[in-house]
């Protein structure tokens, strides 16, 4: 259970999802984009919500991404509905793909009786296939909003093994505020905010500009610190919608409870990021890398991501092999500032390298530790005060099997 004490307040994780936030309902349906599973869904807010988005840095961007960016720009950061489909990415589909994304936005706007510029459109699935709009039109018509979140959480999945949901509660101005999220992602995960989609709802009253800054920072510290296979998708997107119905005083960085709000938002994002990393295609375990002693937090994060993204480290994790040589190799090519003679490495509670000198280790004990569902790798560079984390998963035979047969 997530807990964290902040300045006189506390945020905590509770049972719930995005519909347990005031003002939000969702829907999910099957329209035939996938063989049997739900494949189209929507989030709806009773009021125009202050909204922000963070998008893939892949230069090839899917049509729905472009439409959603346009919506946010034209509405001055307001959204009231989000339409999502899985099974088709609508990426690299030319001018007709953009036409289809606009039509999806228009259909959702009509369905939920909101202006088109207050609708976001997101898609995930196979790249390069035209969107079968007859199926999509039927699916949008079949959407029925409710406070049940599971159909939506299922409708956004592709190769995921299960839904990913979280809900966090925090006190702001003596008002209970909730921040909740739902995400999908299992393969093609190396976001610089793969495919990775994240949707966060909150009933906090927060200024749009502050919400945008908070999401960007939280994304950089969480979603951008996960990797499964090194691929950055054309469709990566994280959206946050704030209904304001908690009725707190408007939040920005000058608000006395800002640290509480940001801590809760970051916790929500981190929980989703870990769920994505742990659910990497074929994965059997989550890998968390903690780096200290870097010259800056940014460099610490870079080192952590280099370690967790190393195929050799990932395969060693699968094989329960405490091969720290692969870890120090990743540190060396990470591009960070370091002294090769002052590095410490530990795998779980076991020190393997101190001041760049090998330590006599119990290989059997380390291997036993690495049987766990979550393993922690620590590195200290002794160059400064910078700290950072990253998350990933082991690399298994099943990853190849799943991706070799993705379209079959």
Curated annotation (Swiss-Prot):
Encoding gene, per UniProt annotation: argJ
One of the protein's GO biological processes: L-arginine biosynthetic process
EC primary class: transferase
Keywords tagged on the record: Acyltransferase, Amino-acid biosynthesis, Arginine biosynthesis, Autocatalytic cleavage, Cytoplasm, Multifunctional enzyme, Transferase
Site (Cleavage): 194-195
Species this protein is from: Shouchella clausii (strain KSM-K16) (Alkalihalobacillus clausii)
Protein task: Catalyzes two activities which are involved in the cyclic version of arginine biosynthesis: the synthesis of N-acetylglutamate from glutamate and acetyl-CoA as the acetyl donor, and of ornithine by transacetylation between N(2)-acetylornithine and glutamate.
Compartments reported by the entry: Cytoplasm
EC numbers, comma separated: 2.3.1.35, 2.3.1.1
Gene Ontology cellular-component terms listed: cytoplasm
Residues carrying the site annotation Involved in the stabilization of negative charge on the oxyanion by the formation of the oxyanion hole: 124-125
Name assigned to this protein: Arginine biosynthesis bifunctional protein ArgJ
SUPFAM superfamilies xref list: DmpA/ArgJ-like
């Amino acid at each position: 259970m997530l807990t964290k004490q902040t300045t006189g307040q506390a945020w905590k994780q509770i049972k719930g999802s995005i519909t347990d936030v005031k003002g939000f309902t969702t829907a999910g349906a099957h329209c035939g984009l996938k063989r049997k599973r739900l494949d189209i869904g929507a989030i709806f807010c009773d009021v125009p919500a202050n909204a922000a988005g963070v998008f893939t840095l892949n230069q090839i961007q899917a049509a729905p991404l472009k439409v959603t960016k346009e919506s946010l720009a034209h509405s001055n950061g307001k959204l009231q509905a989000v339409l999502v489909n899985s099974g088709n990415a609508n990426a690299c589909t030319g001018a007709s793909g953009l036409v289809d994304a606009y039509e999806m936005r228009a259909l959702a706007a009509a369905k939920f009786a909101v202006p088109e510029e207050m609708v976001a459109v997101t898609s995930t699935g196979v790249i390069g296939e035209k969107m079968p709009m007859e199926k999509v039109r039927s699916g949008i018509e079949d959407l029925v909003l409710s406070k049940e979140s599971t159909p939506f959480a299922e409708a956004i999945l592709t190769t995921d093994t299960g839904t990913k949901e979280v809900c966090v509660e925090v006190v702001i101005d003596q008002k209970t505020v909730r921040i909740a999220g739902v995400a999908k992602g299992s393969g093609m995960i190396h976001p610089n905010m793969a495919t990775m989609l994240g949707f966060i709802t909150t009933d906090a009253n927060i200024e749009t500009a502050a919400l945008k800054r908070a999401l960007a920072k939280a994304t950089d510290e969480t979603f951008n610190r996960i990797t499964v296979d090194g691929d950055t998708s054309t469709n990566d997107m994280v959206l946050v919608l704030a209904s304001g119905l908690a009725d707190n005083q408007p939040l920005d960085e000058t608000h006395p409870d800002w640290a509480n709000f940001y801590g809760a938002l970051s916790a929500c994002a981190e929980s989703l990021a870990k769920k994505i990393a742990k659910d990497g295609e074929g994965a059997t375990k989550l890998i968390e890398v903690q780096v200290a002693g870097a010259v800056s937090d940014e460099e610490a994060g870079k080192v952590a991501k280099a370690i967790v993204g190393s195929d050799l480290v990932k395969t060693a994790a699968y094989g329960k092999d405490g091969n720290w040589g692969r870890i120090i190799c990743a540190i060396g090519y990470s591009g960070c500032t370091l002294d090769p003679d002052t590095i410490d490495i530990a795998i779980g509670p076991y020190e393997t390298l101190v001041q760049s000198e090998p330590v006599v280790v119990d290989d059997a004990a380390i291997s036993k530790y690495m049987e766990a569902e979550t393993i922690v790798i620590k590195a200290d560079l002794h160059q400064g005060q910078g700290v950072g984390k990253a998350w990933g998963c082991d690399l298994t035979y099943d990853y190849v099997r799943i991706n070799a047969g993705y379209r079959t």
